[in-house]
Amino acid sequence: MIQSVRIKNFKNFKNTKIDGFTKLNIITGQNNAGKSNLLEALYYLVGKSMHPCTNVLEIYDNIRKEPLTSESKSLMFYGLDTKEEIQIVTTLDNNQTLDLQIKFIASENQKVIESQIIPTAEQTQMSSQLNFTLKKNNEEIYNDHLNIAKVPNFPPIPNQSGYNRQFKNFDSNQLQKLLPFESAVIIPSDVVYRQAHMIQAVSKICSNNQLEEELNKHLNQFDNNIQAISFNTNNQLKLKVKDIKEKVPLSVFGDGLKKYLHIVSAFMADNAKTIYIDEVENGLHFSRMRLLLKNTIDFINNNKDGNLQVFMTTHSQEFIEILDQVIREKDFAHQTKLFCLKQDDQYVIPRTYYGENLEYYFENEENLFG
């Protein structure tokens, strides 16, 4: 499991270290304090594919919906200053480290392009580069460039003219060296952005009768009128609902059910050992927040390897109060921490609150949100 992270020159993090992560980590803080940015920094290192270039592109293209170009690339750098390289270092609880450094390299052609008002078509496609260096325990595993065009095709289509975002994949030896680091799943605040990922996860679950039955039970807990989930011939998710003859498309249900399904299916279908959930409370009634937290703790406790780790961001005082109740009921307080991020001048300052003391913090009217 991830024990700590140090983030330098990434978005609003000039130089911040956060220590003491546990199995269930709740991230709070004021608006623009860096809650989502923290999840993204961790995901850059350990994303679904375990490849930093792929992880960065996924955040830009599928989460932020801001295609990575020679212009938008500066958004990942602190103060938009691409002269300083990004560094993200995570340490596991066994003291193994994973270190990612990202450096922008502007081509001479790109410098000319950016000085002109109207570039030619040929100049528009000339690419700059992001250099990625990935180390494990100070041993270099990967060092290569991701080419980025000024105006890429979007959505990006490989092997098409103008698609300049090539990079070198890991070979089997590099992948072996990355063990025991495991892949991760990120769930954004707006689940519509990741609809394809949810469909893929549910498809995997429905190919296994036992898992499909378990998923149906989870959906029935959320809404006891829901009896089953399935795909139609057009690969559209539909739900069998009590007293309705025709199956009902998932699209007509509210965001709360979609968010719940997305999270539960990620726990069930993915082999990820780390799950990042942004603005977990979005769309959820307080009773369903309780249900989600109970299920999350059950997934962590029932993980066969005992190393499943969850990070959630929230703005909701109500969610934290429900969390306090659930972790005491489930005897999980000692494996829960709350990290409050506060922007203090140039730096993000983390404050740590312990799950077993949440009730005490409430009684003393402690500000848990910065």
Curated annotation (Swiss-Prot):
Which keywords fit this entry according to its UniProt record? ATP-binding, GTP-binding, Hydrolase, Nucleotide-binding
All disulfide bonds of the chain are: none
Activity's sensitivity to pH is recorded as: Optimum pH is 6.0.
Single GO molecular-function term? GTPase activity
Can you name this protein?
ATP/GTP phosphatase
Enzyme Commission code(s) on record:
3.6.1.-
Please spell out the taxonomic lineage of the organism that makes this protein: Bacteria, Pseudomonadati, Campylobacterota, Epsilonproteobacteria, Campylobacterales
> May I ask which residue range the UniProt record assigns to the signal sequence?
none
Taxonomic source organism? Helicobacter pylori (strain ATCC 700392 / 26695)
